[in-house]
Amino acid sequence: MQRETVFDLIGVGFGPSNLALAVRLAERSGAHTLAHCFVERQPAFGWHRGMLLDDCRMQISFLKDLVTMRDPKSRYTFINYLFERGRLNEFVNLKNFYPTRVEFHDYLSWVADAFDDRVHYSETVLGIEPVRGDGARIDALRVLSRDAAGHERQRVTRALSVGVGGTPAIPDAFAALGRDRVIHSSSYLTDIDRLVASPDGERRRVAVIGAGQSAAEVFIDLARRFPHVDANLVMRAGALKPADDSPFVNEIFSPEFTDVVYAQPQDARRALLERYRDTNYAVVDRPLIEQIYEMLYLQRIDGTPRHALLANSAIEAAVRTADGRIELTLRDRMSGATRIERFDALVLATGYRRDTHSALLEGLAPHLGDALTRGDVTRDYLLATPEHFAPRIYLQGCCEDSHGRPTRCCRSWRAVRTKSARRSKTGSRPRTMKAWPGPRTKND
């Protein structure tokens, strides 16, 4: 095991949140003196690679990239990426605010390439341990990791930025069915050819479980790309609902609204988030809904309905049959009647769990008091730790319950303060809070 190296900051994970942090540190005056690095388990930068479908577009404007909303003069903007790639003029000619997901991934990779000397790829963080000082004081954190060759490494840091992303959510009903017939949408492009392979030329019936954007994208991709597949979209909802991305509602993704959400009592905050749930959860972009509706309609013309939307369907049970297929017991949520549907494979578009950070920080639990279990986080995304715990732990992408919906741009640069002179020691709410001003008007 190599000798410990001491850092001012270590980022665990190198997705968009910590990538935005790397940009902020690179551009901050004096930040070059800050010893920092990032540890990433993937062999190279990757962002939702399993869903980089060719014709799928971003749901946010390219202006909400890693840096434009903070500093449009930055060299790391999407516009400068287009300029450096020699495509700026052609992109302007498209007259489109929403690049393809493939292109935006290429932009993120382009930015990530600038920080190769700061990122340790193919390293899995095994755990975080406390470094003790005098008495009960915890002075620093020890990050334990293992690379692809099996070599273990220790690094000591005074601050930690946890940006590990989500973990695919697999509902209990599907957990025991086996990966040979069931995949999560996060690995769709990697696994789908194997999943629907038909050496004998027989048709394959595939169920997509979910009612959100990923479910809709997978459903229409299966229908268009695999002539031998009969795709079925199974969902509890009665219909695919469009995402609300109207201008006034989009104001909830502003920093000012985050202040408002954070200042609310827990019950009021929960109600406020529920009110705007249709901006992000179990909703689909309207153009995609229209494409799916048209596809299902056109089937009726030639009388060969291969694909179907099974709405109002609650899944009561899921079992493997003797021939290896999957049998779903579906209950009609309107009539209460049950029926059995059999499929050759399932794609679960069931979202992500946002609790990975808890397992990562488990070794620190005895020293953190109730902060970790309660999710006690300050407005600056800093875990509120006891007085004897000196290291700073910032949580990225897992604070929706306290801060509201993740903003539709990469804003982790706001979360991490690179100076250690001042830090919040409690998770208390601010005593006063300026009200959210609402949308600006011409009289402002």
UniProtKB/Swiss-Prot annotation:
The enzyme's E.C. designation: 1.14.13.195
SUPFAM superfamilies: FAD/NAD(P)-binding domain
Disruption phenotype: Less virulent than wild-type in chronic and acute models of respiratory infection.
Gene Ontology terms: biological process: biosynthetic process; intracellular iron ion homeostasis
Positions with a binding annotation for FAD: E40, R41, Q42, P43, A44, F45, G46, W47, H48, Q59, V125, R408, C409, C410
Cofactor binding mode and count: Binds 1 FAD per subunit.
Keywords for this protein: FAD, Flavoprotein, Monooxygenase, NADP, Oxidoreductase
Cofactor section: FAD
Residue sites binding substrate per the record: K64, N250, E251, I252, F253, N280
Record family assignment: Belongs to the lysine N(6)-hydroxylase/L-ornithine N(5)-oxygenase family.
Protein name: L-ornithine N(5)-monooxygenase
Gene designation: pvdA
